[in-house]
């Protein structure tokens, strides 16, 4: 009798589990989107808005930096002009000393000319660095603008995704809605390509700047520690 009751209890448990499994099979939660097919993932609007603010801030900083580098570039150009005039004056003085057979003075002027020419190389290297800094800040500003445009497109795409028409599948309204989503997705991706291109240009400008700074260091060392 005990064995029969135990078998009956097991049978009841199996029946209940089978019923629950059947119900779960019929009442399923919506499947999550296939991540392999999601080209542009849905993101919180707050995240996109925050990134737009960051991009604008980046652009403002780049524009402000460019103004400073422009001032330094113009100052470097002025210094080069003054140094070139100084060299011309020294060369004239050397020439006059040679004509007057003042060998010691001519030799002294020759040394001054070499020193001034070495300093001129430093100033020209500084100018190249300033010009490269301007180019980097311009590239940063262009990148920030492209990022803001791409995020704006993504923002419009997400807003469109969240406002589908209350129309059956295959209806004209639904077809127009899907076409609009596709267009926004395409324009968003195109703008993201532009962002990637701007990043590449910025990287090139930064590499050029680093190279010019190295040349400036070499020129400064040659001036301060002549062989």
Predicted regions and their residues:
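Bacterial N-terminal signal peptides that target proteins for export
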Residues: 1-10
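Intrinsically disordered, low-complexity peptide-like regions
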Residues: 4, 19-22
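Bacterial N-terminal signal peptides
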Residues: 10-20
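Boundary at the C-terminal end of the N-terminal hydrophobic targeting segment
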Residues: 23-27
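Extended amphipathic alpha-helical heptad-repeat regions
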Residues: 31-227
